[in-house]
Amino acid sequence: MRAMSDVRWTPEQEQAITARGADVLVAAAAGSGKTAVLVERIIRRLVDERDPLDVDQLLVVTFTEAAATEMRDRIGAALQAALAGNPENERLQRQLALLGRASISTLHSFCLSLVRQYFYRLGLDPAVSVMGEHEALLLRHEVLDQLFARRFDEEEDGPFHALVDRYGGGRDDEGLRNLVLAIYDHMQALPWPDQWLEESLARFDVPEGAAIEDLPWWPPLRRQIRLELELAAEALASARALAARPGGPAAYLDVLAAEEAAVRAAAARTETGSYADLAEAVAAVAFGRLPGTKKGEVDEGLKEAVGKLRERAKKAVRAVQEQWFCRTADEWLADLQAIAPHLRTLGGVVREFAEAFREAKAAQSAIDFNDLERLALQLLRDSTSTPDRLVPSDVARDLRARYREILVDEYQDINGVQDAILTLVARDGQEGPPNRFMVGDVKQSIYRFRHADPGLFLAKYGAYRPWAGAPEPGAAGARIVLGANFRSREGVVNAVNFLFRQIMSARAGELDYDRDAELVYRAGYPPLPGEEAAEPPVELHLLDGEEQGPADGAGSGQAPAASGPEAASGDGVAGEADGEEEDPALAELADLTAMEREARLIAARIRAMVDGTADQPPVQVWDRKLKTYRPLQYRDIAILLRATTGRINTIIEVLSQSGIPAYGQVSTGYFQATEVQVFLSLLQVLDNPLQDIPLAAVLHSPIVGLSAADLARIRLANPRGSFYDALVAAAAPASGAAMAEAAAAPASEAAMAEAAPAPASGAAMAEAAAAADPAEAGATTSTAPGLEGVLVRFLECLDRWRTLARRRPLSQVVWQILQETGYLHYVGGMPGGAQRQANLLALYERAREFDQFARQGLFRFLRFIERLQAEQSDMGTAPALGEGEDVVRIMSIHKSKGLEFPVVFVAGLGSSFSDRDLRGDLLLNRDLGFGPQVVDPGTRLKYPTLAYHAVREVTRLANLAEELRVLYVALTRARERLVLVGSVKSLRAACARWSRGAGAPGWPLPESLLLSARSYLDWIGPAVLRHADGAPLRELAGEGGTAPGSGPDPALAGDPSRWEVTIWDPASLQQILQPRPEAAPPAVDWARIGAAEPLDRPLDEALHARLRARFGWRYPFEPVVRRFGKLSVTELKGYFDPDAEAPAEEMAPPAEEMAPPAEEMAPPAEGSAPPVEEPAPSTEPSSSTFAARPRFLQQDRRALSPTERGTAVHVVMQHLDLSRPLDAEGVGRQLAEMVERELLTPQQAAAVDAEAIADFFASPLGLRILQSRDRVSQELSFTLAVPAAEVYGDLPPEAAAGDVVIVQGMIDLLLEEEDGYVLVDYKTDRRDPVQAAQRYTTQIRFYRRAVEEILGRPVKEAYLHFLASRRSIAV
């Protein structure tokens, strides 16, 4: 089987490409080329000479739509490349033709295709629609509202009320609502949700006399107790090591050893002992008095450090005793029994909600995204299936016969439901060899919050055997590891390996970072230019929150303020403070948040990298396209954050102050944007003008432009009523009641028919206000008459907009208001105008999405927006950046997955891990079920049950494993440079804590240290501290940790990774806040050049010539950008025959007939921004056959225009039934039927000459058509690519080379005969046919060309038939 590309595959990649006959799991590390391997495997399967398959016999499942599109494009490109080398290969041609119908999609899309195909088996409406995320969110809250209201009505003081009292949240029932939805969402990712719910509830039916160790929650609790005791034992071991040092309190050694032994003995009892045994062992741990020491005999610093470590151990043991053994076993069990009835009630509410939600969706003939997978599983799973044994249905067996291979990308991110679907579709050995090919990297499984289950990948990884070249009998499957990294420099690869060998283990990260998991450098970067040194080091910048000084328990040694090479600013070593106590820069630094300080440091490093320093040239990065090194650009840099809320804007602001362009799409802040708040206030006023605050906000906004003084004047007009009443009174004191009635009541149909002209924008309102005094132009606050004019105009607008909101789709109303007020243009002129416009357009898109909901209306839309805000489901600011912009990208680590950047900063490494899903009165777990707290509704006191403790601990460990994987993803995004930045409150204390794992033998850090981490630095710090380059951390740890100068563990000493550790205390960090010292003026004043200012001295002649050449450069393809890229055949005629007069039937109607009303300018197409200057008329086809003019205008005319008459004739010819009589009477009957079917209006039918049509079908050409009517195609639309040079003959050859123009057209009739096609085009011209035919030569030539190129057969004859003169002219 030959390779389909010139790529030199590694042996492991070749195995993944060629392995057959078994289920294959490919563990593909970051940057290992898994997509390329997938594509190559597919291509080779398609062209396999021994066992080929067609592309539509593959099921390729990807994680995102973008990945599916990329996969399809790559396969298509590979097929095209193969076909170019073998153009006669019919098999390749067939695969290319089948590619469009191949099953290459996300799993959701695959499930949707199954649901649409087998809707009748599921009892669904054939026209069932899939609800969008937001529509489903709104509907389920409405269903939940109704459910709770019904429950409250049915019970006065029953189980449901008791449940609300305990888990409602105190003041209302919002806590219980969220809990019901959380349980429901959790169940959607489970293949057997009802069984999971029942088993979770049954666990609390604890029988009398049960033992704690027999409960499902005991194993994780036992592990947690052991971990806490081991931490205490390690603290005592560290104390003992310090006591044994010269000068240490050696008299303590025996006591410390005895205490450590007792704690370790208690920890050992957790493995085998019962609850009672463990309680006894923990109680036996006693801390006595330490022997006395004489003053001066021991080092007081060591003595104090030992005492603090021992005290830490005592607190840990005391916490274990108080948390776990202060209650009897019977008391723990009694809590579980007492809470069981309330959980049963909760389970009933969840089931009732699930059924009510299903019924609500069915009533709208809709399903949501969760339903797609659940319904697909229902189709594929036979009724005899059990959780332990999946039995395929007949549908699944049909799919097994169809798909010869199932390929799954990102397998580590699937959940239980998705895995069950794939299992049922894949062959199990009975229908044929196992045929699943799964690719993923469990180290990059970071979607646990979406219910991804990395345990599915890990289970197969453990069960499958390494691929040995052929399937092994009896093996569950084959495992292939792709460890080669083709992305990152060797320095980055070495650093990642150094870290994760120490911190990722089966317990701490659910996977051992062994040789199979390591990255192997294969990128092959050329040596850096001008440098003989080794790979650039990974930078670790640690920002200390306190001044240098003795650390608690760390002795009195003074650590250096900074270490490592040059400081980030590039001007000397960090940490040399100036000694002034009241330095303004230090005062400013104290007011900064940790993220602001990190941002300033990052800005300094970016400046040094891009611009260079006195000692270092600008950083060079490898350009894969140019195949050379080039200077670093801003677009090469990414700043990654674990959490972006409130941080992206901070970093952008700091970088902007340093002159560094940056962009980050924040996931929050959209609804807080001023322009969005103003427009939502306007919509609230349209819904109900009696809302004072929204109304005042609109009046004060640029839409109306009133000042605070104006608002005060309005209030004085009616101090007691609503602000709307005051507004009406201020607008028209004499007729306030009449205006209130007009604006608050719906407009009548007659009023709508006499609609006023489009209202003025805010600026026009201001102009009206200033009319009384020209000196006040641009203001709206001067005189009462001017203010009244503005208010009257606003009330008129408000009245009309409210009427429109009741009668038109909401998106049209939003767009019309944006256009009429000019607000979209206004915000575009504000700072950040492009972003503000994007935000308003995103609101319009949200309204357009809402228009597709089954239930609509302005009130419901506002409720929908309120629900998004309540759910903290902020849309984030709308994207306003192109991919090619030269800016620094700032994003979350999750968004960076799948991306790569030459330079990566990972910031915020000292931030604490989120514990959001460790809080709450009831926790959930896939394996353990519910973990509730006991809540006393009377006192509102709550305390945890055993189940709560167990679920919380299991969740905490799973979260830590996820955070390890998130860190792995972040670090493996870097190609060439990796910079780590983190802040700690006390770095000395942190280093002392980190150093306790430095003496651990071998690579892995102690499990207790890893599992007690609270931030990424709690993993990175202990690991780097053990490296040869970690001396600054070891020194800073002082006497509280590893002895200074003791060095790293010998097992790690030879590690090839390089680290540059820089420590910043407030004094040293001050340096990057100060301007750089004065230096000699640069040879070239780039700042003046950039600002287009005169220079102090002439430029070097060579530089002057280079600048002149660059500024004089002209875009070589400028002539092309001014030409249309898409043309109709009619438009094309003008380029080939510019002097030709337009035929009568194609003349445009007068402008007054075609121009749309101003208020009906087209809104933007979905996914695109509208033109801000002047919206173009809509070019989308109307639902009506005739869209030139509104019907009511057509009815007032006695005759149609030539264009309209020609269009009517073409519609008739398209819809004529050729099997019926086509004499004049027969044609007339069909015309009447077309009127009844509303294909034509009576006026249009009357304009069609039925006799002329009958004469055509009685002619030789017409009879020929009727005799072969089964081979006739009518109204064939086509798209044809024509070389631009052929269309635009005046273009320079170099400008038009390679470009094409897309030509579109519609062929009236095509008759297929044995030796070719006959093409017919109808014309309604009333001119001489012979002369008119010459004008259509170009049109027919392109019709003929389109048929021959697309259909592959010649057009042997072409005719123009002129109906008016009843002649057919051969062309």
From Swiss-Prot:
GO cellular component terms listed in the entry, alphabetical order: cytosol; DNA helicase complex
Catalyzed chemical reaction(s): Couples ATP hydrolysis with the unwinding of duplex DNA by translocating in the 3'-5' direction; ATP + H2O = ADP + phosphate + H(+)
Pfam families, per database record: PDDEXK_1 (PF12705), UvrD-helicase (PF00580), UvrD_C (PF13361)
Source domain of life: Bacteria
PROSITE patterns registered for this protein in UniProt: UVRD_HELICASE_ATP_BIND, UVRD_HELICASE_CTER
Region feature (Disordered): 544-582, 1035-1055, 1141-1187
Domain UvrD-like helicase ATP-binding, residue spans: 7-489
Record GO terms (molecular function): 3'-5' DNA helicase activity; 3'-5' exonuclease activity; ATP binding; ATP hydrolysis activity; double-stranded DNA binding
Biological process, per Gene Ontology: double-strand break repair via homologous recombination
EC number(s) on file: 3.1.-.-, 5.6.2.4
Residue ranges with Low complexity bias: 548-576, 1145-1184
Binding site for ATP: A28, A29, A30, G31, S32, G33, K34, T35
Necessary cofactors: Mg(2+)
Keyword entries, A-Z: ATP-binding, DNA damage, DNA repair, DNA-binding, Exonuclease, Helicase, Hydrolase, Isomerase, Nuclease, Nucleotide-binding
All copies of domain UvrD-like helicase C-terminal, residue ranges: 553-898
Function: The heterodimer acts as both an ATP-dependent DNA helicase and an ATP-dependent, dual-direction single-stranded exonuclease. Recognizes the chi site generating a DNA molecule suitable for the initiation of homologous recombination. The AddA nuclease domain is required for chi fragment generation; this subunit has the helicase and 3' -> 5' nuclease activities.
PANTHER family assigned: ATP-DEPENDENT HELICASE_NUCLEASE SUBUNIT A, UVRD / RECB / PCRA DNA HELICASE FAMILY MEMBER
Similarity comment: family membership: Belongs to the helicase family. AddA subfamily.
Self-association state and partner proteins as the record states: Heterodimer of AddA and AddB/RexB.
Record's protein name: ATP-dependent helicase/nuclease subunit A
Source organism (scientific name): Symbiobacterium thermophilum (strain DSM 24528 / JCM 14929 / IAM 14863 / T)
